[in-house]
UniProtKB/Swiss-Prot annotation:
Disulfide topology: none
GO MF term set: structural constituent of ribosome
Protein name from the UniProt record: Small ribosomal subunit protein bS16
Keyword Ribosomal protein belongs to the record: yes
Organism field: Erwinia tasmaniensis (strain DSM 17950 / CFBP 7177 / CIP 109463 / NCPPB 4357 / Et1/99)
Classification via HAMAP family: Ribosomal_bS16
Annotated Pfam families: Ribosomal_S16
Amino acid sequence: MVTIRLARHGAKKRPFYQVVVTDSRNARNGRFIERVGFFNPIASGQAEALRLDLDRIEHWVGQGATLSDRVNALIKQAKKAA
């Protein structure tokens, strides 16, 4: 099953997440189909905390992809800010 979820990157104690479309059987940071955004939970100042390609996310959901709980919350946050 195709899912849209977060893949953790960044350094120890400084997480940075890529929002990726992947097969649910792949490892958390493993192979992915497409990168559709990023989330920086510790962004400060002028740093961009969240960027999502909502058109591509809607495309994948239309193809049957499921959303993780956190990604679903981030999409709602992005739509509210837009």
